[in-house]
Amino acid sequence: MTASTILQRLARTIEARKNADPSISYTAKLLNSSQDKVLKKIAEEAAETIMACKDNDREQIIYETADLWFHCLIMLTRHDISPEDILRELERREGISGIEEKLSRSQPNKTE
């Protein structure tokens, strides 16, 4: 099973939870909460991932990153963005220098 397959399956499950009962589904509860609540949860999970990295704790890095990705998928679902949209963007960037890509974003359009 590929990573993209797992992400797609998880995204479908999250999408299906949009209409689930928030009193029995954590995912439905987050999907039906305010955007700020979801964003705070992402910030919390990002901080926990950072702390696991600082501690050089491989197992915790994996665990916390999984939490972070899960909550990011919830955020993406709320904005009707699929994992495939993100994977396409990563594919588009493949082989492009990060410095070069950033410079292209800051250059004004010369045709104007």
Swiss-Prot record:
Disulfide bonds: none annotated. Belongs to the PRA-PH family. Its EC number is 3.6.1.31. It is found in: Cytoplasm. CDD domains: NTP-PPase_HisIE_like. GO terms for molecular function: ATP binding; phosphoribosyl-ATP diphosphatase activity. The keyword Ion transport does not apply. Pathway: Amino-acid biosynthesis; L-histidine biosynthesis; L-histidine from 5-phospho-alpha-D-ribose 1-diphosphate: step 2/9. The keyword Cytoplasm applies. One of its GO terms (cellular component) is cytoplasm. One of its GO terms (biological process) is L-histidine biosynthetic process. SUPFAM superfamilies: all-alpha NTP pyrophosphatases. This is Phosphoribosyl-ATP pyrophosphatase. Transmembrane segments: none annotated. Keywords: Amino-acid biosynthesis, ATP-binding, Cytoplasm, Histidine biosynthesis, Hydrolase, Nucleotide-binding.
